[in-house]
Amino acid sequence: MAPTGQGGQWQEVLCCSICNRHFNETFLPVSLICGHVICRKCAEKPENQTKPCPHDDWKTTHSPSEYPNNVALLSVIFPRKQCMTLSGAVSEAEKRVDQLSIQIAKFFREADSERGGTVSSREISRTLQRKVLALLCYQWREVDGRLKTLKMCRGISERVMIEIILSIQSNTHVSSQLWSAVRARGCQFLGPAMQDDVLRLILMTLETGECIARKNLVMYVVQTLASDYPQVSKTCVGHVVQLLYRASCFNVLKRDGESSLMQLKEEFRTYESLRREHDSQIVQIAFESGLRIGPDQWSALLYADQSHRSHMQSIIDKLQSKNSYQQGVEELRALAGSQTSMLVPAYRYFLTQVIPCLEFFAGIEHEDTSMRMIGDALHQIRILLKLHCSQDDLRKMPKEERRGVILQAEVPGGMGGGPGGSGGAEAGRIGGLHPLYSQIDETGRSISRTNPKDNSHNSPQTPPKQPRQKRYQMGIPPNRMGYSSDAPPFIPSHQQQPPPQFFNSQHLPQRFRGGRQRGAPPPPPPQPMPMLIGYDMPGAPMMQATEVLTADGQMVNGTPQRVVIMQSPTHLPGGPVVMIPQQQMVPPPQSMTPVGGPMGPMGPMTPSIPVQVPPNTMWTATSPTGSVIYPAASPPGQPPHTIWIQSTDGNMFPMFDRGSGGMVWGPGTMLRESGADAEQLLAKRYEILKRLQPSEDDDDPEDGGIGHVSYTVASSVLDDRMDHHPLTMIPVPTIDLPAIPISFANMPTEETMTMIGEMVQNRPRAPSLTAPSSNQPMNVNASASATVQAECGTMSVMDSICQPISTSAIHNSATIPQPVIPMVQVPVQVPIVPAENFNPNVPPPPPPPQGQPMLVDSAIGLLTPIRPILVAHPQNVVSNSLDKIVDVKERISEAQGNASEAENAHLRMELRMAESQMAHLDPYTKNNCLLRALQQVDMELQQLHLNPTVEG
């Protein structure tokens, strides 16, 4: 292997193994056959001519002073210098090898360390770094060095192939397939901790050479572990014993008429040897099942850590057969040529470029150790690493940017190299992957790799992708059903023309999967969207004409409406919610009827006539007498008709008729991208089904008392948390209340306030607040006062509710005689105000006019049963939460074994935040929204010709 003896760190290759000096123009690096590097001064010393390496013994055929300089390591130290001038290459083949080595060394950079002389790379994995450094440190002047170089090239290509396969397959699916294959052979893995305890108990029982029957061994292990693992059973422990039996760890002694005895073999009577054989058997089962699993994932699966990667890598290397490499190449070729695979075209084209490089090393002959073969092998390694790094950068991108790059990837026939033919055919192979790697300089490095903006004139710009939680599944907007996206969203009424037929093929623009025309400029960034929530209002006038309402409540056509803007406390991160009263709709005129006719069999669809809108309006909402379009797919759980609303930026959003509930319109109606793969849909379906299953917490109908009416009333009256209560404005009719009694018109005396305070402190707590009445006395304990007393002695109303509350009379104290003071009804429309001194000279404020909006507390968990609108659009909340949960879990699966503990903790925190978004929804609403989302997911899976019940 490469410099393992240099200070105990294989990365420290920029200093001499003998004198520890850092390489420079004076102390030039010289590679040895074993892979260690010394300086030119030490190589020329007489005592080092016979044994130049202090760590390894090997025979030399040339004097170390005749070895050429390692210009690849010099290029890492001096990246801006022409290091080829320091090369000692003589022939053209040797110069070619040096040039290719310099280009491969560009993947590394000098890093800071305690000793110095360390290199690192941000582009290739740690395992590849070790192999590539070993390749750069071999001495190709010797025959043994050239043989090691060819073997290392084969190892690098094999590692790249494994990483490509691991990047294609899903870690979750691979692990499930692995354990299914293990169970199919009568074996079982119980988890890292439990499996470890079972193996240690088996070893403790049999390490002295005892012969025990299998059933007795299983029963002993079960009884011992029953206290720590209640789920342990004879079946699962017997499967673990079967796994060891399959690995030939026992000597079986058969007896006539009785059960056989098992004796542990001598070579497996230590835990390390037994565990290694146990792990080898599981890896062998994976190989037999055709599964490719990396050492980092093996360490995570079997040990739940990353400290056993070397242990698992040694097992993998030992069990790999000579045909494993060729089998992997055949798998990639079959995947690239399959028409039924779910690979995007850009990735399929990437595989077609990688497979020839892998096939080169599949048929390489190690007997040919000429310099020409070394040059060809390094040339293929350089191409393979660049292709792999480019695709690896694509995988490390955020998912939205990655999809944008994949969608912008050009057709393979139109891909070429850099300008002026720089790089030749090889530049075309590397630059043809996607636009970020479209130019290769004279050193073979991608120009756009470090600064993608420099190549913006040659590659199309990547459009800003919408985040995953913005892709909803609530309908199909018209611009995804064949409508022209370049038409103006609104036109004046005097310029309205008959709707053209956009379903003619010659009028349809060519589109990518994302729905945007090729070469079109990227859409503007999304803005917060308002939402319309309808509610019942008696006595609504007949709407005779099309009415348009803006977000600020201004009237466009018709009569003005009472529009109130409400910021939903749960809508993430949407815009304001707009509520309009339900209207009695007049049947639309004949001219406004859709071309397709009334509801019936779906026929060719035509766009509706746009609505007249002033230029200063941002969002408009129209009644059903305006634009009515019957889409091909209705949202789940909604009537089949939809009223589409178009914004000034061309986006279309549907408004659903909820019958007596008015009209509902929100941003949660955009269609999921058509490129959503089946794996994400299945993952989302699994999340929905998991949340629809009844849990143990559902047994308590009162939810710990939170859903009880007493909690609702008490929380609304007694809760004084004012820092996080969002306010909603709901217009309701004003309630006339009786006048305040004369006795309360004057300021109470100090003696009266003192007696009231003592009475409040001495009275006991009321037993219940469920059904207070005016004739029932209410006793309150001094530990939790029922009123909030200010310094001046007046009470400050901390909250208000939508209906008057009949309060109880305060009972007389047992020690201080005091007449009963009746409590008046608190008016509904008392705003939240701070405590201040009462001034009897100031008249009370006049009552608000009829229909004026009032302030209502809509904090989460308070007054839930009597809130007409607690969540503006619960379907959006559920869709946002599900999409984010699936996205975060997929990122956690991708980061398994590769990310740091801090990144994993951050992902787990994101998952908890995503799962908490639905916590404030009541169970009935949440289940309804989940059922609608499940129906939509099943419909999309059916469109992909997948059976949800089978795939799920």
Curated annotation (Swiss-Prot):
A cellular component term, taken from the record's GO annotations: cytoplasmic stress granule
UniProt feature coiled coil, ranges: 80-113, 882-922
Keywords from the UniProt entry: Coiled coil, Metal-binding, Stress response, Transferase, Ubl conjugation pathway, Zinc, Zinc-finger
One term of GO molecular function: mRNA binding
Keyword Zinc-finger: yes
EC primary class: transferase
Function summary: E3 ubiquitin-protein ligase. Regulates the activity of daf-16 and is thereby involved in regulating aging and stress resistance. Regulates nsy-1 activity and thereby attenuates the activation of sek-1 and pmk-1, two components of the p38 pathway, which results in susceptibility to pathogenic bacterial infection. Acts together with rege-1 to repress the expression of the transcription factor ets-4 by binding to the conserved ADE (alternate decay element) and RCE (REGE-1 cleavage element) stem loop structure in its 3'UTR, which probably controls the expression of lipid metabolism genes.
Protein name: Regulation of longevity by E3 ubiquitin-protein ligase
